[in-house]
């Protein structure tokens, strides 16, 4: 099984997600460091519900589509992994460079896990309905 295409696609999407993460990090700093795991899982829930709503109704009154919500799911997921690793705090305690390094480390772990699972499951996810994720 050749997973070169999958790895390239993953990296392209992660570049897009990281770019947005870096922009928000520049604007707001690592303000998410104060969020508890329950706050982050609520954000993931809200994004998944919005995707489902857009899929079912086909209507967005705020003018944003589904793709930004999937990007948010990825970024909130990585933020969640960072928070689980470092714990939540009462004040921002990391600089943008450290936040990006943590982001990159977790994104790399996700890629490596995906490649291992792709081997074992023969990329079965490619045959799944996208709505299975929401």
Language-model features, listed with the residues they occupy:
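Intrinsically disordered, low-complexity regulatory regions
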Residues: 1-134
């Amino acid at each position: 099984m050749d997973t070169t295409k999958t790895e390239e696609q993953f990296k392209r999407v992660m570049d897009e997600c990281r770019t947005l993460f870096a922009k928000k990090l520049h604007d707001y700093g690592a303000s998410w460091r104060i969020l508890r795991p329950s706050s982050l899982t609520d954000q993931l829930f809200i994004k998944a519900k919005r995707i489902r709503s857009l899929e079912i109704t086909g209507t967005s009154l705020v003018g944003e589509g589904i793709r930004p919500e999937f990007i948010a799911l990825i970024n909130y997921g990585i933020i969640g992994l960072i928070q689980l690793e470092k714990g939540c705090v009462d004040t921002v305690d990391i600089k943008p460079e450290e936040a990006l390094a943590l982001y990159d480390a977790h994104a790399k772990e996700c890629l490596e896990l995906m490649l291992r699972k792709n081997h074992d499951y023969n990329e079965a996810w490619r045959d799944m309905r996208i709505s299975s994720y929401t």
